């Protein structure tokens, strides 16, 4: 299984990034290959000028096309997800998430931002034809405490449990996801099949 994780925060230190990293570790511990992207890893000019021919953008598009699922994490600013994330998602082809499972993760200053996932992020994922967008996770800033120095960030126990449950649901959804059959393979199967009437 291949999962692409996308971090929508332009900041190197972000709570959504903490949850994305925990998700990556959890999935890798279960044998899932995870390739991580952060919006800040892309040249700003590529995002702002929609450079579809950029080597980094093309590499991103190829890995998304190969992925079984995506984990998309974003901070919530002014009742919506990060604008930098939107510019990156806009560089994907129209049906880029077809046959893919998506787990959205969002963080915000208060619980009042929780609906941003449903009313802002999920419609964009739907427009990209995600096969299934899971309920996802929202965490307010008080549930994630940055670690001092090299110490890891601490999650509130309730958040830790919700993250684990959501990742378990995501993992199960990936496992049961039907795999599209390439036209050439399908033709071979039809030719070699035994038919009876």
Curated annotation (Swiss-Prot):
KW Flavoprotein (keyword) present: yes
Record keyword Oxidoreductase present: yes
Leading EC class: oxidoreductase
One Pfam family, short name: FMN_red
Classification via InterPro entries: Flavoprotein-like_sf (IPR029039), FMN_Rdtase-like_dom (IPR005025), NAD(P)H-dep_FMN_reductase (IPR051814), NADPH-dep_FMN_reduc_SsuE (IPR020048)
Catalytic activities: FMNH2 + NADP(+) = FMN + NADPH + 2 H(+)
GO biological process: alkanesulfonate catabolic process
Annotated Gene3D superfamilies: 3.40.50.360
Gene: ssuE
Similarity section: Belongs to the SsuE family.
GO MF annotations, alphabetized: FMN reductase (NADPH) activity; FMN reductase [NAD(P)H] activity; oxidoreductase activity, acting on NAD(P)H, quinone or similar compound as acceptor
Function: Probably forms a two-component reduced flavin mononucleotide-dependent monooxygenase by binding to SsuD. Required for growth on aliphatic sulfonates or methionine but not arylsulfonates.
EC number: 1.5.1.38
Protein name: FMN reductase (NADPH)
